[in-house]
């Protein structure tokens, strides 16, 4: 199946490590900031300077009050301004002049201006880093997903995958762009604030710090609970998105069975489950915020009570009490920011684990370290003792002992009852799966020894249900060869019998086909797919019941285009219509995963057996 990440690098599951903070995902996330390292450093420096300036504000305000009321001398921080701007316009209380107050006010203005400048630098640079990291992570995740095997996408709902690309990575963005800088800036504010508080009054500082242990314990308890609930919420929201994706992509089936209410109820139930988790998360936050805030208020209340007693006793100037109060609020804010960061980290932990789980997923189709080069491909495809089963669908063999050779340029038709293994057999040709036993070769080389991209460059597939992308007709044809010229696109459409109907549209080849080609008919979509395959010009062609869902008129046009497409190419046709079977070089009859008959149409009819039974059931009316 899929190789899981190693124990050392794998992120924890939803319950694993739920009682502790796992920093491994965040160390890994920091690796994505390397291309923006100088911007991150600049943001860190600006944030540190801003934090120091914010610490200067209470000190300057305290000096302003002490000087205004003659309660103390000017501190070194504002002394240079008093010396520079101070005058003798008249003596005030305690020898302080109005010019001294003016100088201190100028310091305040300078602090505010510098703080505004550092805030601008920090916010802009962090925004650049955060958006850049998220864009890089989304690109890497999407590119990685495209390289995984078909089996991966069969076991993962599309909505779940898109949820990882959108909501989970958005949750990570705040952690990447904010946590590190906030950690540094709040550390500067906390440590610097506590140091200044000790300088002002050590006893009062100890009283204030007595409240901290209770606040930290509360943050840890609530943070652990919040992490569990947030992980569950993200999982439930992804499940809801998966259901919505299914219903929207199959809207015609939903409406044809009048199942709108059923799908709405299914999605509504999934949303109600996610909503219940969201409410649990809201309740935890609602308890967490006031609990921590109450602890802060208790600390501030203690400072006011004890500091007021010191001021009344003359042991603490009133300006210093104001400075102490402002710094206490700053320290409390820093502690609150740390608890908020802890919650943010806890919420992002679940999202980052899920994203990295996808990034760590490995395809069950390993690429060779030194792939064999494909030069001139002749197109001989050989199945040697091939046995295959899906594993997750039971232990029965879907293909059992297949030995088959398709010579270069030969058309091989595959027929048999439903579930015989026809579609599974052709999926082995472009190596969407590997056989469990035996091997498949191209020109004598095991497909597992080839680069999958190189192999698939030489294989073209036209399925029964054609998927077009929501662009123009020209873009969909050019999908077979992106660098093709407009003339080559038109030539491929002409060969596919598509040019005539394309030119009937007002916008011609610029006509938008809609999501999955919904604006075109089935026959038109099929001819666009054939033009796409013609432009790719593969050596090997796989036609998976390419005309079975078309009406007679569309089938005739598509059949002519297919005959042009098959010229000179090794072709596997899962046959459903008589015309394709009659013209095949060989017809291979499958039943229960085994080859039971091989031959041309007339030979198999004369031989009898399963093929003639299928012919009599399916083809007699057409032949008549």
Give the residues covered by each predicted segment.
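Short intracellular "coupling" helices and adjacent cytoplasmic loop segments at the cytosolic face
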Residues: 8-19, 69-73, 131, 139-163, ...
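Juxtamembrane helix-loop junctions of ABC transporter transmembrane domains
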Residues: 14-22, 45-46, 53-69, 107-158, ...
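A short amphipathic helical element positioned immediately N-terminal to and/or at the very start
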Residues: 22-37, 161
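An intracellular "coupling" helix at the cytosolic face of ABC transporter transmembrane type-1 domains
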Residues: 30, 34, 150-151, 167-176, ...
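Transmembrane helices of ABC transporter permease
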Residues: 39-52, 181-232, 303-316, 333
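Transmembrane helix-loop-helix hairpins at lipid-water interfaces of multipass membrane proteins
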Residues: 40-117, 198-203, 301, 305, ...
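Helix-loop-helix
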Residues: 196-210, 280, 284-353, 358-359
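ABC-type nucleotide-binding domain
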Residues: 374-624
């Amino acid at each position: 199946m899929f190789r899981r990440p190693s124990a050392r690098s794998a992120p924890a599951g939803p319950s694993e490590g739920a009682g502790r903070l796992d920093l491994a995902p965040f160390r890994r996330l920091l690796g994505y900031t390397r291309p923006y390292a100088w911007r991150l450093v600049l943001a860190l420096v600006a944030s540190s300077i801003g934090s120091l300036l914010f610490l200067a504000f209470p000190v300057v305000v305290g000096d302003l009050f002490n000087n205004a009321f003659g309660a103390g001398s000017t501190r070194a921080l504002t002394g240079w301004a008093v010396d520079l701007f101070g005058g003798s316009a008249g003596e005030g209380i305690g020898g302080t002049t109005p010019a001294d107050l003016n100088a201190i006010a100028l310091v305040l203005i300078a602090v505010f201006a510098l703080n505004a400048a550092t805030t601008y630098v920090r916010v802009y640079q962090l925004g650049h880093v955060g958006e850049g990291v998220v864009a890089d992570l989304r690109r890497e995740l999407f590119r990685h997903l495209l390289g995984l095997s078909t089996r991966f996408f069969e076991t993962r709902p599309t909505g779940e995958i898109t949820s990882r690309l959108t909501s989970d990575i958005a949750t990570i963005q705040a952690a990447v762009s904010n946590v590190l800088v906030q950690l540094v800036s709040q550390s500067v504010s906390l440590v610097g604030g506590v140091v200044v508080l000790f300088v002002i009054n050590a006893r009062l500082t100890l009283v204030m710090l007595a409240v901290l242990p209770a606040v930290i314990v509360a943050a840890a308890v609530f943070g652990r609970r919040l992490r569990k609930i947030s992980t569950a919420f993200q999982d439930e929201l992804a499940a809801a998105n998966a259901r919505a994706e299914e219903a929207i992509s199959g809207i015609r089936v939903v409406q044809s069975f009048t199942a709108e209410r059923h799908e709405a109820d299914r999605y509504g139930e999934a949303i109600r489950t996610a909503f219940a988790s969201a409410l649990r998360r809201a309740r935890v936050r609602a308890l967490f915020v006031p609990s921590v805030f109450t602890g802060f208020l208790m600390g501030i209340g203690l400072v006011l009570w004890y500091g007021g007693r010191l001021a009344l006793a003359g042991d603490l100037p009133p300006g210093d009490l104001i400075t102490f109060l402002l710094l206490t609020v700053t320290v409390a804010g820093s502690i609150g920011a740390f608890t908020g960061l802890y919650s943010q980290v806890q919420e992002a932990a679940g999202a980052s684990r899920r994203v990295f789980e996808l990034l760590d997923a490995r395809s069950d189709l390993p690429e060779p370290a030194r792939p064999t080069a494909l030069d001139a491909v002749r197109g001989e495809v050989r199945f040697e003792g091939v046995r295959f089963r899906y594993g997750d669908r039971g232990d029965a063999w879907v293909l059992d002992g297949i030995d088959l050779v398709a010579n270069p340029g030969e058309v091989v038709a595959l027929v048999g009852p439903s579930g015989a293994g026809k579609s599974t057999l052709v999926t082995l040709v472009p190596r969407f799966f590997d056989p469990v036993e035996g091997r498949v070769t191209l020109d004598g080389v095991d497909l597992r020894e080839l680069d999958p991209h190189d192999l698939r460059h030489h294989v073209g597939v036209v399925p029964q249900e054609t998927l077009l992308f929501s662009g123009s007709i020209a873009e969909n044809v050019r999908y077979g060869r992106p660098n093709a010229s407009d003339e080559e696109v038109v030539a491929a459409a002409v060969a596919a019998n598509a040019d005539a109907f394309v030119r009937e549209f007002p916008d011609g080849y610029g006509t938008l086909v809609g999501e999955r080609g919904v604006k075109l008919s089935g026959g038109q979509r099929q001819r666009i797919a054939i033009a796409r395959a013609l432009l790719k010009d593969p050596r090997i062609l796989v036609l998976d019941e390419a005309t079975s869902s078309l009406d007679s008129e569309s089938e005739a046009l598509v059949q002519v285009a297919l005959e042009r497409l098959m010229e000179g190419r090794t072709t596997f046709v899962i046959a459903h219509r008589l015309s394709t079977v009659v013209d095949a070089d060989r017809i291979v009859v499958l039943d229960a995963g085994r080859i039971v008959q091989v031959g041309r149409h007339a030979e198999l009819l004369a031989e009898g057996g399963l093929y003639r039974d299928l012919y009599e059931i399916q083809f007699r009316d057409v032949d008549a």
